[in-house]
A protein has these predicted regions:
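Short amphipathic alpha-helix that is part of the acyltransferase structural core
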Residues: 1-26, 61, 67, 118-167
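N-terminal charged segments
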Residues: 1-82, 100
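Conserved beta-hairpin
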Residues: 37-42, 100-114, 177-191
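Conserved acetyl-CoA binding element of GNAT-fold acetyltransferases
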Residues: 51-66, 200-211, 270
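Acyl-donor-binding surface of acyltransferase catalytic domains
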Residues: 68-139, 143-144, 240, 246, ...
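Conserved acetyl-CoA-binding loop-helix of GNAT-fold acetyltransferases
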Residues: 70-78, 206-209, 215-232, 255, ...
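Short, high-confidence coil segments that cap the C-terminus of an alpha-helix
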Residues: 86, 178, 233-235
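A conserved beta-strand-loop-helix scaffold within acyl/acetyltransferase catalytic domains
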Residues: 160-212
Length: 276
């Protein structure tokens, strides 16, 4: 396996591990209400939320990445989503460009899968080089227990999530491998983010700042702080991801990642199931 293929595989594995633990954190009542669960099928990680119509929560990560896939593997993944959603679930199967075999995308297309407008995610990875110091007029630090609810609400609002998901976000900050962060303006929570630490691997996610407080360095400083904390925790591989720009649209998230020392492991295709 080439170094680039190994980086792409690592970025998928780290993301998958973070989301498996994220799903495990869901309050039982909410998990039952939304049908939240994960499964491993054909060495891929499957995320299910059949009563939450958003592809970010219904997708397959890593098919053909950790071992070569065959058409029976692909059909098993499709069948699992079909069973979960009674044939109507909108979901994605991610196609890593280093997945095997090379014609995985052709198999998907022959089964009616298509690429949405945002065709790819930039899978980003970095090592232990210190991040830059990014000046900000906001306060950025670890979230205190009394701030966790406000941080979760701010994150949910920034990502357009339903209010019912706020307790789910809150729940991850009480788990051993998760750390929560707050962005504040004059003592008020206006943003936040999460760091998942899994041995020598780390994942950054849920980073957000309320619209009216953007362009003040908060997002960059939040990313840099989480990177420093991951390195201090002994992590040697730090992963994150973002949707790649469509046409010439700006992508401040991607710009901040590059600024903070992330390199692109790969551009991963998002194949939407037929009818999405």
């Amino acid at each position: 396996m080439s170094a680039q293929a190994a980086a792409a595989a690592a970025s998928d594995a780290i993301e998958a591990a973070a989301f498996v633990d994220f799903y495990a954190a869901a309050p039982p009542t909410l998990a039952a209400q939304l049908g939240l669960r994960t499964a491993e099928v054909a060495a891929a990680t499957l995320l299910f939320a059949p009563r939450l119509p958003a592809t970010i929560f219904n997708r397959a990560i890593g098919l053909g990445v950790h071992r070569p896939a065959n058409e029976a593997d692909l059909d098993a993944v499709i069948a699992a989503f079909g069973e979960a959603g009674q044939g109507t679930l909108a979901y994605w199967i991610h196609a890593n460009p280093f997945a095997a075999p090379a014609n995985l995308a052709q198999w998907l297309e022959s089964r009616g899968f298509t690429l949405p407008e945002r065709r790819t995610w930039a899978k980003m990875l970095r090592g232990t080089a210190p991040p830059p110091d990014i000046p900000t007029s906001l306060e950025v630090r670890r979230a205190r227990p009394a701030e966790v609810s406000a941080v979760a609400q701010t994150i949910a609002t920034a990502f357009g999530m339903a209010p019912m998901l706020v307790p789910w976000i809150e729940a991850i900050f009480g788990r051993p491998r998760w750390r929560g962060y707050a962005v504040l303006a004059d003592g008020k929570v206006v943003g936040g983010g999460a760091l998942f630490v899994d041995g020598q691997d780390a994942w950054l996610g849920l980073g957000s700042v309320a619209t009216e407080f953007r362009n003040r360095g908060g997002q960059g400083a939040l990313m840099a702080l989480r990177i420093r904390d991951a390195i201090a925790a002994g992590c040697t591989r730090i992963a994150t991801e973002t949707g790649e720009p469509v046409a010439n649209e700006p992508n401040p998230s991607l710009a901040n990642m590059v600024r903070c020392g992330f390199g692109k492991a790969c551009s991963r295709l998002n194949y939407a199931a037929p009818g999405n």
